[in-house]
Amino acid sequence: MNRKRTIILDTETTGINQTSLPHINHRIIEIGAVEIIDRCFTGNNFHVYIQPGRSIESGALKVHGITNKFLLDKPIFKDIADSFLNYIKNSILVIHNASFDVGFINQELEILNKKIKINTFCSIIDTLKIARELFPGKKNTLDALCTRYKINKSHRNLHSAIVDSYLLGKLYLLMTGGQDSLFSDNTINYKENFKKLKKNIQLKNNTLRILHPTLKENDLHEKYLQYMKDKSTCLWN
């Protein structure tokens, strides 16, 4: 049986270009990715720090805490490019605010004169787009969504590509619980998918309606949250 790999991915960078595309004149310094198959974390992860060949901006340092000194002995992107590409090849990539990370990764590939873009050999799902459909008008950062879904993020003092990938993986499973078939292996048709998804979660008038649980349902929900806190690696509805 050919089981499709889902890779949850995040990056940290030297900073963000405020006047052009975010990746212009900046580089990736960390890649974190976790593998999910059959809605289970497999433990087959990819994590690397990268020497960017330029200094880290102070604003970015405050976000992720990764220093120039720490990166001095780390590999450059060229040294890890092939292993990274082999890891994500033909997978479904799940990324929060995908255009940001994809822009940085494609720039790194362009610097190496590789005539490829990751969206040509991976399907890409943007969880920010999913969140905006589910919660229009709400704050939909990773931090805000973890709070909304009661995902424990007490260990997330600073941004970390590998930690954030794991949190995003748990979040993605919860947001799409029981809805794997909504997403095509080759292309993501958000318009049609979210027509189905909105119907399934009873969205009306483009706003999220709160359906109050019965006492029994609430008790089951509390037991389910406790189950999650016990660090189960698989999530089902």
Swiss-Prot record:
InterPro entries referenced in this protein's UniProt entry, alphabetically: DnaQ, DnaQ_proteo, Exonuclease_RNaseT/DNA_pol3, RNaseH-like_sf, RNaseH_sf
Catalytic activity: DNA(n) + a 2'-deoxyribonucleoside 5'-triphosphate = DNA(n+1) + diphosphate
Complex formation: The DNA polymerase holoenzyme is a complex that contains 10 different types of subunits. These subunits are organized into 3 functionally essential subassemblies: the pol III core, the beta sliding clamp processivity factor and the clamp-loading complex. The pol III core (subunits alpha,epsilon and theta) contains the polymerase and the 3'-5' exonuclease proofreading activities. The polymerase is tethered to the template via the sliding clamp processivity factor.
Protein keywords: DNA replication, DNA-directed DNA polymerase, Exonuclease, Hydrolase, Magnesium, Manganese, Metal-binding, Nuclease, Nucleotidyltransferase, Transferase
Residues binding substrate, per UniProt: D10, E12, H64, D164
Species in which this protein is naturally found: Buchnera aphidicola subsp. Acyrthosiphon pisum (strain APS)
A GO term, aspect molecular function: 3'-5' exonuclease activity
A Pfam family annotated for this UniProt entry: RNase_T
Entry GO terms, CC: cytosol
Binding site for a divalent metal cation 1: D10, E12, D164
Entry protein name: DNA polymerase III subunit epsilon
Cystine crosslinks: none
CDD domains per the UniProt record, alphabetical: DNA_pol_III_epsilon_Ecoli_like
EC number: 2.7.7.7
UniProt-listed PANTHER family: DNA POLYMERASE III SUBUNIT EPSILON
One example of a Gene Ontology biological process annotation: DNA replication proofreading
Cofactor(s) the record lists: Mg(2+); Mn(2+)
NCBIfam families per record: dnaq (TIGR00573), dnaQ_proteo (TIGR01406), PRK05711.1 (NF004316)
UniProt cofactor note: Binds 2 divalent metal cations. Magnesium or manganese.
Active-site residues, record numbering mapped to chain: H159 (proton acceptor)
